[in-house]
Amino acid sequence: MGLLHCFHIHASAEKEALVVAVVWHIEIAPEAGDAFERLYGADGEWTALSRRSRSFLGSSFLKDLAHPERYLLIEYWSEMLVYEKHLADFGAEVQSLEEERARLVVRMEAMGVFSALDVPDRVGPTWSRRSG
């Protein structure tokens, strides 16, 4: 499942957004939790690839407490065009990680691209940065 075709953004909305939040709803296969969390967690391969872009600001990776097979992934980017370029520039690596993800995920839904109205500082446990 490629990412570029999932979002259609009105040009004027893109210009207004200082920080965009790309939001995904993900349901994983039973027993896939540990592997999925390693892939998308702060030290995971997906986050490491995203960090290679100057536009990547961080991510929030959320697990549903009532339904442990459900997750939300929110990636914060400073520019939508650079996000799209990042996906294109690293297409082979993105494809490889998407294939790995396909073995773990039952359903992945692109919820949309949102304008981040109140963004926390780039530190803390919800952001994809680790120190030490």
Task: List each model region and its residues.
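Residues embedded in well-ordered secondary-structure elements
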Residues: A13-K15, A48, L62-K63
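Short, well-ordered beta-strand segments in beta-rich or mixed alpha/beta enzyme
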Residues: V20-E27, L57-D89
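Short, Lys/Arg-enriched N-terminal segments with co-localized hydrophobic residues
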Residues: C6-L18
